[in-house]
């Protein structure tokens, strides 16, 4: 468990950011939150590139997502925290598995991780990724977020749209039985997204790791047991959710 630094009296120590003429109120609040975030401090101490690494670590502890020898695609990988975690978990240093990190932005190299600076929406992206992986992916994971506008409904719709694009990409690169994990923001459109995922995966649920800030609407959608195109066609013809279970689990710790 990650706890904030404490003073001699046992109370958490807080860093207060002084007001600056060139700094907006929102940026000042963000900076103060970062400075007082125990996960930010721990990430620096342990060598992770971002606090988001702990979100994947915690989700993996609960769902056993990362297995040795897996082939993984990390969408919107910058700055690389999730790829770092996955590399350790799948045994990349021992020559096991394969990870391809994709982003429009360049990232500092991660030992053993292949990087593709590209748009995953490019027509040739799925084919290129499968070639780089040496086969279909076992896991497509995404911690991507659209640029925030500050308008909750707009931000929700934008990230749901981004996840829908990631799902379409995953359909083209995942191996049967594969897993899809992506960040979303609550706001009302989750049901439609989950219904779409249930056509392709045997189980769909929401996950909110402890490292996600309690006051944040952020959560993750986890879909396991990818059916593949043939199984999906049979499911559609039958007019059911398939032989597996498909459930939407309400997020906790809101």
Swiss-Prot record:
It catalyses: uridine(2552) in 23S rRNA + S-adenosyl-L-methionine = 2'-O-methyluridine(2552) in 23S rRNA + S-adenosyl-L-homocysteine + H(+). The active site is at 183 (proton acceptor). Residues 13-22 have a biased composition (Basic residues). Keywords: Cytoplasm, Methyltransferase, rRNA processing, S-adenosyl-L-methionine, Transferase. InterPro entries: RNA_methyltr_RlmE (IPR050082), RNA_MeTrfase_FtsJ_dom (IPR002877), rRNA-MeTfrase_E (IPR015507), SAM-dependent_MTases_sf (IPR029063). One of its GO terms (molecular function) is rRNA (uridine-2'-O-)-methyltransferase activity. It is found in: Cytoplasm. The keyword Lipid biosynthesis does not apply. Pfam families: FtsJ. Its EC number is 2.1.1.166. S-adenosyl-L-methionine binds at residues 80, 82, 103, 119, 143. It is an enzyme of class 2 (transferase). One of its GO terms (cellular component) is cytoplasm. Gene3D superfamilies: Vaccinia Virus protein VP39. The keyword Transport does not apply. Residues 1-28, 231-254 are annotated as: Disordered. PANTHER family: RIBOSOMAL RNA METHYLTRANSFERASE (PTHR10920), RRNA METHYLTRANSFERASE 2, MITOCHONDRIAL (PTHR10920:SF18). Specifically methylates the uridine in position 2552 of 23S rRNA at the 2'-O position of the ribose in the fully assembled 50S ribosomal subunit. Belongs to the class I-like SAM-binding methyltransferase superfamily. RNA methyltransferase RlmE family. This is Ribosomal RNA large subunit methyltransferase E. The gene is rlmE.
